[in-house]
Amino acid sequence: MKHTVMTHSLTLLTTLLLAPLAALHAADSGTLAAWMPRAEDGTQLWWVEGSPQVFNSQLPPTEETLCVRYGGDKLLFDTKRVRPVDGVWACAVVAEERRYECTGRGAVKDEFFQPVRFVESGRFFQRVIIEDLKFADVEGREFNGRARLEITAWPDRLAFRLECGGEAKLELRRGEKTVAGTKSVLLEIANQPSTAAVESELPVTFDEALGCHRIALPEKPWSNASGTYYPEEHLDRVDRWRVTLRNDADTPTVARLMFTQQKHLPITGFTPMLCEPDGTPTGLPVQVSKNWHQRPEKGHLQHEGPWFHGFAAVRVPPKSKRDFVFQMVYARYGGVCAASHAQLSLIGWGHNQFWDQAAVGSFGESICFEPGRVQRRSFITDVRPLMTLPRQPDAKRWGWAENCGGGDFLLWKDTAGRYQPMKATRTDYRSHGPCLTDVGYREETSGGEIAARMQVSLPATNDHLRTFLRLRYDVRKPIRWQRLAFFQLGADFYNDVPARRVAIGNLTGLGEEWEPRRAKDEYDRQAVPLAGAGSWVSVHGVERAMLQKGQATASRGFVVRTWRAVLGGKAAAPHLSTYCTEWGKDNHRTAVELVPPPGITELQPGDFVEAELELVVFAADAAAYYGPDAALRDLLARDADTWRPVHREAAGNALQPQAQRGTIEKPYPLVVAVDDQQHARVSLQGGLGHLPVTFIGLTRPQGHRLLVNGKPAEHWQTDWNSATQRWQVTYNVASAIGGRLELELENTR
């Protein structure tokens, strides 16, 4: 394929702060619907038998097979033998008239150089690189060159690329397809030819190896008058550039797009969006993959950070042309700290496996997730309080807070005390932000006894970190246990805050507060009932003297917003256990866990747990919080590092919205289905912070306007549901503490 370069000079629209217009004049919705992805337009990547290396697991998988789902097809690839599980395959080098077949890859000797490396993984694009390939001839003699294999997948394309230095001849074969050459050979297994043309004011090139158009964002430094991590003068910055897609053919096609940037990007928090020329969000998804990791003392690796790669697969109808604006939202959106959720590559850090990073604003991480639980056997990893200064005396605003991380979803140890790892953990990126993220995870226990689904959402806000968690566990086979938890705040090997007090309660107030015992690997209390509506748990009372560098002075907790469970064949309420660990002499931690009720010793097929939790984090030192929310500042001045902030959140956001038009699907975060006239009207009392409000069931993304107490809301997020073929819009509405909110979504057409 010829390497082509296309550039189109248009007026540069960078650093526009204009909101999407309240009166929308975009193209016809039927036309836009034809450009939206279908249910089959996706990719996923997962370890079939679970991650090969999970910290402190005695039951590693016997196979190291990856599953790559692309569109309606799958590839099972054995990463040990470096070959597909089935079918005809050849990966060989020919040097000095000897043929060497690939026999596998090198062993893992150092986590930094882990040879199976995930570069990008998301909704539209997967890239895995296997380094340190081993080759041998028929007599067992080894090839002494260095080679790597790259696997890439789009929904409509699968390709392998073999790279090796020197003059050796390279060969790849899959089925009836074969390629040969030197240096680098590309074997495309499935590839729907694209007739899409891409034009932009930005440089556009075609990447033959990746099968997509690359669109390079400007590499231009930002000003930073105060020398802060995120430049204060750019808090409300939004960048926009024009992109045009065209298809002159008589048949539909797909435009595969890759937006790239390496430098001068606030990499910890941003959201790319494809919008109409007037700034109206279209709902066309853009995958967010990025990396900031480097460890020069260990060496430099291909694909180490920093970089951002944004991927889109846009259907382009025949004989059509459409103008878009590619928009980058950074720290704030409409004056509210924006939410984002991205795949973060670990190449340059180590382990090189799956990692997700979510942020409110662009001031460092807010909460991270490690599908596979590789490094510290915890799914919930780094967690940081929002807009909270670290303890250093010269700390500045708009930068990284310290870490209060650690937590997990399902934890099961069998009757012999052996940790049961999870397998087939896969990620479904439904929305990257900037008003409300939506990412789902699915996995199951190694023997298929329990199927687990977890959904995490991060809302934009200006007060404190909230994370909405929705859990669903279905029992498929009988299980017994020495230890079973449906959720952990503070994991066994990741629990950064030495908090000394635990409290439980409900909407009415405090139920009980106590100081857990200081012990090692044993329970303090077991199966304490969480009674009453809006039950909550607070972990506070930070022992400052035990804080180490980088650990946050923060209190944490969670609210049980909804709970349904059948355990042992009977309806079961939530219960709490507190589990003690010790990280070195006298360095004690307490994990709080949701567990089965007392007396239940076995789960049977048909048992389940379904829960909605709200995880909250607060600064434990009032003076450290520098955010703009006056109500939170007053609360922390009185009650920081106590149970009261968690109770306030539980009661203050126990919303009871009433719908005059449309249907309430969920009270908090509020989800409203519009009526047949594409209209909704809802009233509610109170609330705290900014309330995420989502309207679903829209037949078009434009022609709507939200009135909040009669005033139009000017910033929103649009998402497309490919299963229902409908749009939804999400707003962040400032709460009326003690007051009333009237919300009306108007159909302006």
Name the predicted role of every residue range:
Residues G166-L245, D250, M258-D278, P478-V566:
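Polysaccharide-binding surfaces and accessory modules of carbohydrate-active proteins
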Residues A27-E97, E199-D239, N247-T251, S320-N403:
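Beta-strand-rich N-terminal accessory domains
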Residues P60-T62, T79-R173, V179-S184, A190, ...:
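Extended, loop-rich substrate-binding clefts of extracytoplasmic carbohydrate-active enzymes
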Residues A33-A34, V204-F259, D641-V693:
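Extracellular ectodomain segments of secreted/surface proteins
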Residues K109-Q114, E120, V128, K423-E443, ...:
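Non-catalytic C-terminal accessory modules of carbohydrate-active enzymes
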Residues T31, T182-R214, Q287-F354, A527-E665, ...:
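Beta-strand-rich recognition/accessory modules
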Residues S9-A23:
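Bacterial N-terminal signal peptides
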Residues M1-S9:
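N-terminal secretory signal peptides that target proteins for export/translocation
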